[in-house]
Amino acid sequence: MTTPETTPTAVLFECTYQGRRHIGLGLPRGNEPLRLVPLGDRNLADLLLAGDDPADAEAVTVPAGEVTFRPPLLPDHPGGAMVGGFMQTHNVKVDADTPAQPNWFLKGLGDVLRLPGQDLRAPVGSVALTEEAEVVLVHVTDAAGVPRYVGYTFGNDLTDIGRFRRHRGHLSYAKLCDAAVAPWLFRGEPPRQVTGHVTIERDGEPGWRGEFTTGTKALHYGLDAIMSELFSYDALSVPGRVHYVYLGADRSSFHDGFRIADRDRVTLDFTSHGVTLSNTVRCEGP
């Protein structure tokens, strides 16, 4: 896996301010003003692939409430992004049937990504929904068709685990729910250890709370090996395509007997990294 050419872990984000695209520098704190660099006609993904400094233009400081955030590096056309991930990658989920390469699934194109505060859509006939707090790797495919790692963020891979448990061949259907993603792109090696907690509210009251641990240290698999196998398939190597790869999760509310329902609010607090995702689940029909 090719890693960014940066020594310290920097944080970048994209947003719209006064109708124009900007790059943000650093992890925002509360309602503090944001430091932004106008993107102009530049493309952030191209800048990162070229090793250019996206912050080489003059920065402006603006009120946090006047910007609209975007998923990191999300192309303007949803078809320019693929959202997928691996299943049962963590040591706590290893059993006698664990394969040498974890199952990979496709959640959808770029339009399934949801930022904090947006609804997470799930099928109205879902059997048993659960949250999955995960590290998300971001890769950009270069002109030669090579997916190159540019950083990581955090997400919630909402899953109909009940459907998968009912029929093991239905993993692909179980994953066809929206995925929450943080707008921040961490420019460094994937984190070894991430800790935090989940809070699920129902009708404004606490419904369930639990802790989670994730990161590469929690994986049963070698990250380089599973990513190399995934990107050995030419079908995934379209130049310019952005890949969001969810790395799998610790045990969730489902394993504690809780079932997420329509209108539940799910909050994932990645405490170790200062990132919070909070979304309301909506079960909708076609």
Q: Model segments located where?
A:
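Short amphipathic beta-strand/extended segments with alternating polar/hydrophobic composition
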Residues: 24-28, 33-48, 208-216, 275-285
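Active-site microenvironments in enzyme catalytic cores
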Residues: 2-21, 27-31, 36-202
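Catalytic-pocket segment enriched in acidic/His residues
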Residues: 2-6, 155, 161-286
